[in-house]
Each structure stands twice: as structure tokens, then as C-alpha cells.
Amino acid sequence: MLKLNCIKNILKVSSILLILTQLSCSQYKKRENIIVASAGKIESLDPAQANTLRTLQILSALGDTLYKINKEGNLSPSLAKDLPKVSKNGLLIDIPLKENISFHDGSIFNAEAMAFSLNRFRKIGTLNYLLNDKIEDIEVKGKFLLRIKLKKPSSSLASLLTSVNLTPVSPDSYSNYKDSFNNKKFVGTGPYFLESFNSSQQIIKPFKNYWGEKPLNKGINFINYSNSSTLFGAIKTKEVDVLISNSIDDLQRLTLNNMVKKDQLKSGEGDPIEIGYITFKSNKLPLENKVVRKALSYTIDRELISQQVSFGTREPLRSIVPPQLHKKEFKPWPKYNPNTARSLLKTEGYCESEILSIPLTFRSNVPADKLLALTWRDQIKRDLSDCLEITLNGIESTTVYKQLSEGAFEAVILDWTGAYPDPEAYLTPLLSCNELNNNSCLKGEAVFSGSFWGDKKLQELLEKSEELDGENRLNNLIKVEKLAAQGGAYLPIWLVNPKAWSLKDISQPEFSKDGLIILKNLERD
């Protein structure tokens, strides 16, 4: 009798599990919106405040920019009707705008709306230096004609106008937010409108009055998970349709790539736009010593780190600009050479009786950071233990970003993605300095980057590049980076390709030139 009851209980449990499985499959099949998952919360959808890749990803679907970079790498009009028209003296830029475009609130997109958005960004934007360093004034010359007056000629402005941060917002909906951020809403001109928002989930739906190519799906649910394991589990159990690679553990990334090879998933990859690097605080000893910084530039075995940390998925990098933006092979930072490092450290009194100790901070919530820190520390122990030691300190990323400009870290692991695909979008945020005392930066982007390093000649070359075009401009920016390599305030480590994986019944993810998934092209079979 007891055995019979056990069998009945087993059958009951089996039936319940079967029903739950069928319900789960049924829910999966009936899913209308495509669910896209990434790591980290989204606290604000204001383009003037956006500074994370996940925020820019959703904004790219909710808004449009004046221009885009097409597949061939050339500037292409989007909200603009034609390419910018530049005056002979290079100080006036006229931008004709497309007509018959409306915002999600029904108001009309025109030159007044574009001027409102650009001026708002100039006033409160987190990255407002991008415009304020270049622009004198913005004028409305006609209902659909915008004029930008420059402080001096700028060859990079056109590329800058492709930045998602400069997507226009409706003056009607943002009339009370001219001087402050509108964190929980977004009203733009894009192919989707925002249906609901909280920091963990955002739902967007196709905008029926969209002026351009309509989305191929019925909507997107953005889900923001807290860690890599949850993201990895969600795509494996089909809880989500698309997984974005940001903050995915590299071992799990390798597993996902193997699932693609076995035809269990699809994947898409964009041009490498994210650089990983270490910043050295150069305004205080021992790292104020240029020879010490130069020695450190020889101490990192990028090939070893790439293999041990990322299984080769992160490409070793000896530049602070993604190579495709220079359009030529360029590696100004030196290769790994512990003997050269030892010789340089000996000239400064280390190795024989004194060991140089460098505290290295890594972001505790970024999986690759800790592995990089551990690998470098162990490599130093193996090759340079008589001269150098690395001590480790893990701090949550938001705290790191807040304290960078305070000079809280002697050495810190960071990453950077340019706001637009141009060398200047990497060089200026790391190297620009408005007030110098010898090689110590007192005011400027080099302070906010945590290096506090500057160079007068480098600054002159950065400014000169704005007067140049084409090959001459690229060659000038290469000179800038050579000086940065000699300064040694940054140590580039690797280059990261944006990647996404999708379930078999979802189309292969496609990426734009700015490293963002083209969400409107995602389609369920």
C-alpha cells in the first residue's frame, strides 16, 4: 500500500512538472515583445545625462540623431536633410532638416526643437564640453534650417553630431526640464516610444507615426540584471530572447560562443569600440616620476592577460584609440619587456634595496577587472618581484567614477567607449587639459579621468587637429597619441568588440558603427 501511495505521489509530481513545463513553453511561444537583457540598472533616460552603453542602447531606439555613420564609414543624413554646409571661413555650419517628422507627443520636429535640445545639452549635459569647446552659438535660420556658429573651425563636429547624446527631445514635453534632467521619461522622434520605465525594466513599442523605416518587431522589453550569472542563465533557459555582452563573464562568453558553433544560438558582433586601460595618478609620487610610469608600461604581458582573462576574446591593445579609427596599424605603447622595466626602475633606486609598491584599484562588479588585476599581480611576482609589487583593492564602479577626479586612486582599471566613432572621442576625454602646471593638469578632462597628466605640446596638437581634414588630421592625432604614450599616464590593455546572442527563433543581432544593436531589425521567426 505504501509503495502504491509513493507511485501515486510520483505521478502527481510528474504531472505538475509537465503542466509547468507546458505553461512555460506556451508563455515562451506567446511572447509578443522581444526581451533584451543586459547588466546593470538604468537610472536615467535623459540623453543629456546618459553615459553608459546600456542607456545609449535604449536611447538609440527611442530617438534619432542628425547624422549617422553608414556601413561604409561615411557620414549619412538622418534627421538632417543633407550633409552640413560649411562657410569658407569654417565658422558657420548650416544644417537643413527633414520635414514632416513628429515627436512621440505629436509636436513637430523643426529647427527650433533641434536648437532647444542642443542648447539644453550645452547647459546641463554630463559631456557638455563636447559642444561647449567648439560652439559659440546656435541659431534658427528657418523653420527647417539650423545654423551652428563655431568658436574656431572644427573638422570633428560633423562626426560629433552622430552622438546619441545629441538626440533631440520635444520642447513641449521638456519645457520644465531646461535646467534639469528628466530621468524617468523620454520623448523623441525614434522608431519606438517609451511605454513604461523603471530602473530594472523598460518597455518600448513601435511609434506608428515614425518617419523612417518601421521596426520589424512588436516591441522590446529591456531587462536589467545585476550580475553575469543571472544573465547567462536567462539566455540558456530562454527567459530572454537577446543577451547583450556588457559585463558578461568571459568564461560564460566562451560558452555562449560554443553554443553558437553548435547551432544552439545566433550571435552578432560590432566593430571594437571599447578600450580597457589602467590610469596612473601622475601628480603625486611615486607615479609623478615619469621614469617609473615608463617602467610600468613595459611590465604588462597583454597576450598572457588576453588568454588567461578572456580566452583570447579581448584583443591586446597598445593604443588608446581603436585601430580602425586611425585607419592604419599604430601601436605607440611598448611591448612587454621585464628586463627594460627592471633597468628603468634601477635608475630610480628600486630593485636592489627598495621595492616599488603600487596599489591597484579594480571595479569589484566588473568580472574582467578582478581577473586582470590578479593576473598582472601574479605576473609581476613571477618576473619582477625584486623590484615591484602590486597590491589590490576592489571598489564598486559607481564609487570609483565619483572619486576619480578627487585623486583617490594611484592606479585604477577602467574602460572607455567614445561618444562617437572618431579618434578625438577617445583622446580628448582622457588627455584634454585647460590649465597646466608643467605636466600636472589642474583643470580639464585629464582631471576627471584620474590621471592629472597634461602636456603643452599635446594640447596644441589636439587643438590643431580641428583645423585639419582627412589624412592630415589623422596623422596629427597620431602625434597626439605618441606623446600620450611617452607620458605614460595611461596603460592600454585590451580592445572589446560589442557582441549579442539571440535565441534560434530571433534574427541575428546587427550592430551600427557606434557599437549599438539596431533594435528595430530584430525579428521573431
What are these regions (language model features)?
Residues 37-88, 119, 187-188:
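N-terminal lobe/hinge region of extracytoplasmic solute-binding protein
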Residues 72, 162-215, 219, 229, ...:
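Gly/Pro-rich hinge or "lid" segments in bacterial periplasmic/extracellular proteins
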Residues 82-125, 147, 231-237, 286-288:
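Aromatic- and charge-enriched surface segment that lines or borders ligand/interaction sites
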Residues 130-174:
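Surface-exposed binding/hinge segments that line
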Residues 138, 195-203, 221-284, 307:
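Extracellular/periplasmic solute-recognition and catalytic clefts
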Residues 199, 346-418, 498:
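Ligand/substrate-recognition segments at binding pockets and active sites
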Residues 201, 206, 297-328, 368-378, ...:
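Detector for C-terminal structural segments
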Residues 287, 315-348, 364-372:
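Structural transition elements
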